[in-house]
Amino acid sequence: MERKEQARQAIEEMVHRETRAWDAQDAAALVALFHPDAVWPWPPTERDHDPTSWIFVMGRFDRDRWTRSWQQLFATHRLVHNRRAIQKIVVTDEADGGFAVVDVDTLWRDGQGQDSHWHGRACKVYTRMSDGEWKLIMHTGLLAY
């Protein structure tokens, strides 16, 4: 199998691993996906396509801080549904990086019945580490298209 196809399959599997981690509410599995230098900018709303308004909710990847944040979410919310669909995967000619465009429709409900709906399209950027492992290095917040 050619290197680019292997990379495409590895990135597809990374998306599926992330989906399974959200489904299982497994914070350890989620943080295992991230590169140590990962960043995750968020638009204030799914309609804010202009990056000049974007923010960082959790800062640069910090395993402990991100784990605690997701554990708090899982402790206070019930996952109603988590639907994800890969729209496109692009791999570099060198097969050392790529991105996946993923449509997300995830609904959480807290103990008071308040919903938190994650809905939109994300660009998830991956890099192949020197040991061959793939890591998520950048992820945009969800945008409506």
Predicted features, each with a name:
Residues M1-D37, G113:
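Short, low-complexity N-terminal intrinsically disordered segments enriched in polar/charged residues
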Residues R84-V90, V104-T106, R121-T127, G141:
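Hydrophobic/aromatic beta-strand elements that line small-molecule binding cavities or substrate pockets
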Residues F34-H35, W42, V104-T106, T140-L143:
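Short beta-strand segments enriched in hydrophobic/aromatic residues
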Residues H49, L107-R109, Y145:
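Short, solvent-exposed loop/turn segments at secondary-structure junctions
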Residues L107-H117:
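Short, cysteine-centered beta-strand-loop-beta hairpins and adjacent loop/turn segments enriched
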Residues A27, V31-E94:
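A solvent-exposed, acidic/Ser-Thr-rich amphipathic alpha-helical stretch
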Residues F99, H117-Y145:
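Short beta-strand edge/turn micro-motifs at domain boundaries
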Residues T92-E94, G111, M129-G132:
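Flexible loop/coil segments at beta-strand boundaries within sensory signal-transduction domains
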